[in-house]
Amino acid sequence: SVNDPETMAADAINAIQRGYDCLKIKVGVNPKLDIDRLAAVRKAVGDDVCIRIDANTAWEPKEAVRILNGMQEKGLQIELVEQPVKAHDLEGLKYVTENSYVPVLADESVFSPEDAVKIMQMRAADLVNIKLMKCGGLYNALKIVAAAGVYGVEGMVG
């Protein structure tokens, strides 16, 4: 959930105590507050816990790069950012991938094996998220996995 920094830090500690070693945090509405939340969570859980962020298509490409690089400069150690720009803005996605220190995961941009291949050919993302429901089932998911192997792009099922 998206709460104030203190609540999010407490929630993060709770998740770690329950055995989680990687956290996914929604971002995208208020960059300053996002950074404050992430800083509180990072301070609470330490450096050994992975933090991933999901912008849910909230940013414009240049804004995404500025925000993500700012997060890295503050030492927040973000493992990856999920879908920082609009789903169909593959050039924007590529811009973020090429100019950010944070690895980019394409999610909402991947609806089919053809979408995934286009993203991989363009090098528009570092990783692709494969969702069975969204891509049309197991057969299409396996096509995406095969393409990821060919293009050297990491796939994630989620």
Residue ranges and their predicted role:
Residues 25-158:
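Catalytic core of soluble alpha/beta enzymes
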Residues 1-10, 14, 31, 35:
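Active-site beta->alpha loop and helix N-cap motifs at the rims of alpha/beta catalytic domains
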Residues 14-26:
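Catalytic domains of carbohydrate-active enzymes, especially glycoside hydrolases
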